[in-house]
A protein has these predicted regions:
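Basic phosphate/pyrophosphate-binding loop/patch that engages nucleotide-derived ligands
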Residues: 96-104, 118-132, 227, 231
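Contiguous beta-strand/loop segments that form the cofactor/metal-binding neighborhood of enzyme cores
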Residues: 168-248, 282-296, 332-335
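A short helix->loop->beta-strand "cap" motif at the edges of active sites that frequently abuts
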Residues: 74-76, 101-103, 203
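C-terminal helix-rich "cap/oligomerization" subdomain common to oxidoreductases
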Residues: 54-57, 103, 283, 287-335
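Beta-loop-alpha module in the N-terminal Rossmann-like domain of NAD(P)-dependent dehydrogenases
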Residues: 40-97
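Predominantly a Rossmann-like dinucleotide-binding segment in NAD(P)-dependent oxidoreductases
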Residues: 111-183, 187-190, 322
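N-terminal Rossmann-like dinucleotide-binding module
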Residues: 1-39
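Hydrophobic residues in well-ordered beta-strands that form the structural core
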Residues: 57, 80, 105-107, 134, ...
């Protein structure tokens, strides 16, 4: 049994990590570092390290690097919530440290196991040459909530919050782009950090458009894929987050089931509805356990997460300079 120490018990720790850890039969939640009441609460990070084999970092973004570094130095396996770190140098240091310590290091890119993404991934080869991929994550939050994500600083803003998910999904399907163009804005009155982004990743004839808005009362399609053999469009977010917020046990048969179907349009104009694959976030922690106990590949390679950070850096540069950046421009950022 792998003893797990959970650092942070806010939205990520309480809603996502704890329920998924509890239903994985090879993991045991042994310690939780939080100011909230919890039966596994410990008084310090040091106490948590003493009781843990695997440390899950679900604290605010700027804490990810120092906490993950300390855990790896103490020969603990580490899961880091997204974003992996707030800069590339930190990501490089953690990856190198994990290699030296021969410890498992992975990043919680749970959206790889969204049912709608799995459906889009499955249908992709049937669309011929895909020429346009659009992914949207829209919300309607005209009022600014209090919290560290809304305060200027490294790791704040919607590009650091939702951007890693959309970018990671795109990289899983298409790999690194040849160029990027980005628009990143703070649109809400009184907003201190960005709450809107529009990224275009360029690949030969393919364009990948990743967009998020906080002022979208009527959301755009979650996915829209258009190719030489037809299109696939799916509305609505994967239900697992809302199910977890509602307290549903991830082991329940209805967990991850999305009744909203996608629409496949053929070359002849005929349409066909497609059932959405069942989402399965618990697969991430099953993969973590297999990596620790059996030497299996980690469910998310931290180098993949680093690639996403690189694109976020390039997106900010592109937006600030008002121009598209060829991917070789990343060389100065990657150091």
């Amino acid at each position: 049994m792998i003893r797990v120490g959970l650092v942070g018990y806010g939205l990520a720790g309480r809603t996502f990590h704890e329920p998924l850890i509890r239903v994985c039969d090879k993991l045991e939640l042994a310690a939780v570092l939080t100011s909230r009441d919890h039966p596994r609460r410990v008084g310090s990070f040091e106490d948590l390290l003493e009781r843990s084999d695997l440390v899950v970092i679900a604290s605010p973004n700027q804490s990810h690097f120092p906490q993950a570094k300390t855990a790896l130095e103490q020969c603990k396996h580490v899961v880091v919530d997204k974003p992996f770190t707030v800069c590339l140098d930190q990501a490089d240091e953690l990856i190198a440290l994990a290699d030296r310590q021969e410890r498992v290091l992975t990043v919680f890119h749970n959206r790889r196991w969204d049912g709608d993404f799995q459906t889009a991934k499955r249908i992709l080869p049937e669309l011929g040459e895909v020429l346009l991929y659009e992914a949207h994550w829209d919300r309607f939050r005209p009022s600014i909530k209090q919290g560290w994500r809304e305060v200027p600083g490294r790791g704040a803003g919607i590009l650091n919050d939702l951007g890693p998910h959309l970018i990671d999904q795109a990289l899983q399907l298409f790999g690194m782009p040849q160029a990027i163009a980005a628009d990143v804005l703070a649109q809400r009155e009184g907003a201190l950090v960005e709450d809107y982004f529009d990224l275009t990743l360029e690949y030969d004839r393919l364009r990948v458009c990743l967009r998020s808005s906080t002022l979208m009362a009527d959301p755009r399609p979650r996915f829209a894929l258009h190719g030489t053999e037809g299109s696939f469009v799916k509305f609505g977010l994967d239900p697992q987050e809302e199910q977890l917020k509602a307290g549903m046990d991830p082991s329940e048969p209805a967990f991850g089931v999305d009744l909203r179907q996608g629409m496949r349009t053929l070359r002849n104009g005929k349409t066909k509805t497609l059932p959405t694959e069942r989402g399965r976030y618990v697969a991430f922690y099953e993969g973590v356990a297999a990596a620790i106990l059996d030497g299996a590949p980690v469910p998310v390679d931290p180098r993949d997460a680093r690639a996403g950070l690189l694109l976020i850096d390039l997106a900010r540069r592109s937006a600030a300079e008002g121009r598209r950046l060829p991917f070789p421009a990343a060389s100065s950022t990657a150091k």
